[in-house]
Amino acid sequence: MVEVRHSIPCEETKRLELSLSQQTYSQQYASIYFARLTALRPRITEAASKKWPDKQRLERVLDVKSDEDCWVVATAYMTTALKPNVMNDVTQLHTIVTTTEESPYVSPEDAASGDIEYALEDDYGRIDCSGSFLYDAGVVTGVVLAVLGHEDEQGRFVVVDVCFPGIFSHSIPMTTDESQAQPEYIAAVSGLGLSNDGIEGIQVHQLVDFLRGTLPHVSSFSPSSIKRLIILGNCLAPSIEIADSASASVPIGKKKVKRYGYDTSAYNPNPTFQLDNFLDQVCSSIDVTLMPGPYDYSSTILPQQPLHPALLTKSKVWLGSSLQTVTNPTWLSLGNHFVLATSGQNINDLRKYHPKKSSLQCMENTLLWNHITPTSPDTLWCYPFTDKDTFVMEEMPDLYLCGNQPKFGCKTVINEGNRIQLVSVPEFRKTGVLVLINMHTLNVEIIQFRPMSVKAETPITS
């Protein structure tokens, strides 16, 4: 018998949806950097004034001095030999290729030495930096920060310290209630990876049965305590080109690319049908929040737009009731908590600059920087906003979810009385992991689905 359960109220508080009438691409991307600098400058100025009260602040990077340390607020720009260049892509391939590969932007040799080229830029100009301090501090292109230092004989700025906006206080303090006898959970999953072969994995079937309450309970855990499932993108596997008899004899690299229109021979509807069936089954007993990822049929640039109802032939009947489609990234008001959720592109791109950093470290950095995706639009595509950078954080989340990560992890960040739970959600197709968050305490545990078993892990409260 399928379990039907009451839900936790969920509202998308900051819907980053772009209507067709709003979308114009004639403007330059410089505007988004200026908007970002304008929004974050007051916060950083306040933080830096407290950190360096006896140091002189200069209004422009071009005014830095050589005889004494001073500090300025600017946007960092990072140059590496392996970083993709869209102009080179267009010149060499006459097309634009999506950057979803895991290849890093920084070579191991450069990462070990810290010998990375940086520049600092504001409204008035740009100055080059020397030393490895910025790379050691985790700085990437697009981060707005205050830097303390002086100009050397070569006219480069020598950085001796940095200051970020930092984690600021919640406008509404988070409340937790550990006295509740019956815990209520939300479940988070990412990277279902439904594929072109049309064969659903046993793990996906187990997940459906578990969420519907038709799979034997795991230990003392009851699926009825799960009130909502959040799918953090990549429901579909990466597209694989389907070779046909006409193209099989064409040597690799010689096949003519179709530049206009859509090549219908390369489309396989099976993954979409599988996703539709999955949602139709799960939504009959539990509320679902569905976010697109880089492999799903949504816009390529951030913020990715919600999946179109036309893709969901069967499950669209649940839209407006138990099925909620959201943008990527998105802000959710979930019960008494404020949730920031992403499909993981922002964190995966940061790890390409700093391969040795974990997903949780990169997530914490975005909080310190007050920006969800600082590498946009340089190496992570986004819409060319003009008047406002919509990825600047105006609030701090209580819960920060990031999907499609290499492994599961969670960390509680405490700063000035704020408690923020960070959760990196791994790809389900590779790990079989379903993450559960107790909405009374924000403690985290996982359930792992395997072909022959379902295993509940020890609750994690760190």
UniProtKB/Swiss-Prot annotation:
E.C. code: 2.7.7.7
Keywords noted in UniProt: Cell cycle, Cell division, DNA replication, DNA-directed DNA polymerase, Mitosis, Nucleotidyltransferase, Nucleus, Transferase
GO molecular function: DNA binding; DNA-directed DNA polymerase activity
Top-rank EC class of the record's enzyme: transferase
Subcellular localization: Nucleus
A Gene Ontology biological process term: DNA synthesis involved in UV-damage excision repair
UniProt key word Ion transport: no
Principal subcellular localisation of the protein: nucleus
The reaction(s) this protein catalyses: DNA(n) + a 2'-deoxyribonucleoside 5'-triphosphate = DNA(n+1) + diphosphate
InterPro entries named in the record: DNA_pol_a/d/e_bsu, DNA_pol_D_N, DNA_pol_delta/II_ssu, PolD2_C
Signal peptide residue numbers: none
A matching Pfam family: DNA_pol_D_N
The organism's place on the tree of life at top rank: Eukaryota
Keyword Nucleus: yes
Gene Ontology CC terms: cytosol; delta DNA polymerase complex; nucleus
Family under the similarity heading: Belongs to the DNA polymerase delta/II small subunit family.
Quaternary assembly: Heterodimer with subunits of 125 kDa and 50 kDa. Interacts with cdc27, however the function of this complex is not known.
Role played: Required for replication of the leading DNA strand and for completion of lagging strand synthesis. It is essential for cell cycle progression.
Name of this protein: DNA polymerase subunit delta-2
Lineage, uppermost ranks: Eukaryota, Fungi, Dikarya, Ascomycota, Taphrinomycotina
